[in-house]
Design a protein with these regions (language model features):
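Conserved phosphate- and dinucleotide-binding cores of soluble alpha/beta proteins
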Residues: 36-166
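HTH-adjacent hinge/linker in prokaryotic transcriptional regulators
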Residues: 1-15, 21-26, 30, 36, ...
Length: 166
């Protein structure tokens, strides 16, 4: 398991991250998130200390965006940072639809000991306008088994560890 008891982790916004949040409720953790749904859900569990980054609420994702949250993210040193994306690609890296979201996601990962992309294989080969980071800047990529073999082989030559989730 990537997440261990006592870890300080950052969770990006989105439906994939909510699924991850559901898998870690049994662990004592410190969780920092931009996602309002994740913050409210995890706050129900006494062994999990939840911090929401603050800032303006993005109505499309019900998450915090803007400089306020970015400043907090720039001053923390989490064990793990889980980032999601609109698209990911060997050549283009991880991408986001807006400059503001791309910047926030960069800060979310910047100081983490492990930088983990959590992305559905259906988003592979798709990309948005703004680059977040190259895949080589990650320590781990977690995706599902529907990734084509050729893509999987290409990803296994990179420095991030490729993890196929059940």
């Amino acid at each position: 398991a990537l997440v261990k008891a006592g870890d300080a982790i950052v969770l990006d916004a989105g439906t994939t991250m909510i699924e991850l949040a559901r898998q870690i409720t049994h662990l004592p953790l410190r969780v920092i998130t931009s996602d309002l749904h994740i913050a409210l859900f995890l706050s129900e569990f006494k062994q999990i200390e939840v911090t929401i980054i603050g800032g303006r609420i993005d109505d499309s994702s019900q998450s915090c965006i803007g400089d306020h949250g970015r400043r907090l993210l720039q001053t923390i040193w989490p064990d793990l940072a889980f980032v999601s994306c609109n698209g990911w690609d060997l050549e283009k890296g991880i991408t986001a639809p807006t400059e503001e979201k791309a910047a926030l996601k960069r800060d979310l990962m910047a100081n983490a000991r492990r930088r983990i992309l959590l992305a559905d294989s259906s988003k592979y080969g798709a990309w948005s306008l703004f680059n977040i980071a190259p895949l080589a800047s990650l320590t781990d990529i977690v995706t599902d088994a529907h990734l084509p073999d050729k893509t999987r082989e290409a990803l296994e030559t990179l420095s991030p560890q490729l993890i196929i989730a059940d």
